[in-house]
């Protein structure tokens, strides 16, 4: 049986943080911004294609599917940017606005990567595999409901949620690719 860990990608999160922070501070500075969403799409697509290459040859990867998932996040980013414009306009006199913008960019990066990760798992990985094991970061910031899931194997069709689905979630999946009927039966017995 093949088991692949799709661990949380801190490098992708950092790239997203830099994108959101830069966007927020450009809005804050009052400069007219022309956001390059292609760089955002590239971050998302490179992330998920590199994950999919763990179990599939590059020539068999449907990049269009990755692009569709990235487009959802870009739409969400545009909504965030519009809301941010309004928020900054209403709060530009506050002393702690820069700190709030930085914190928002950090949360936004983690949340957007989690949303993208969730969509990648549900729309691409679940089509190739039946099962995944829930993993947490194992630190004090893991919420109790996710800690209770740590190490539990789920069937994609029966899982209430998947890693990354809830706001700020940093959990990740170990995906099972059983190769024989016996391996599937073994998972089902422990499921």
Regions found by a protein language model. Give the residues of each.
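Aromatic/histidine-rich interaction motifs
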Residues: 126-153
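C-terminal edge-of-domain segments
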Residues: 146, 159-178
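N-terminal leader/targeting and assembly helices and adjacent pre-domain segments
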Residues: 1-120, 124-130, 177-191
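Betabetaalpha-Me/HNH-type nuclease active-site subdomain
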Residues: 153, 158-159
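Generic structural motif
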Residues: 137-139, 176-179
């Amino acid at each position: 049986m093949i088991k692949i860990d799709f661990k949380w990608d801190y490098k992708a999160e950092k790239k997203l943080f830099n994108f959101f922070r830069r966007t927020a501070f450009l809005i804050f500075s009052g400069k007219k911004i022309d956001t390059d969403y292609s760089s955002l799409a590239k971050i998302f697509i490179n992330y998920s294609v590199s994950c999919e290459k763990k179990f599939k040859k590059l020539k068999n990867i449907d990049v269009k599917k990755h692009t569709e998932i990235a487009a959802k996040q870009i739409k969400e980013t545009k909504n965030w940017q519009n809301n941010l414009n309004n928020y900054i306009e209403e709060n530009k006199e506050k002393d702690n606005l820069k700190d709030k913008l930085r914190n928002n960019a950090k949360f936004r990066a983690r949340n957007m990567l989690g949303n993208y990760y969730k969509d990648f798992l549900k729309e691409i990985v679940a089509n190739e595999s039946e099962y995944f094991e829930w993993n947490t970061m194992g630190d004090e910031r893991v919420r109790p409901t996710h800690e209770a899931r740590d190490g539990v194997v789920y069937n994609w069709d029966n899982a209430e949620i998947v890693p990354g689905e809830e706001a700020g979630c940093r959990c990740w999946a170990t995906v099972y690719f059983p190769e024989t009927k016996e391996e599937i039966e073994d998972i089902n017995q422990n499921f």
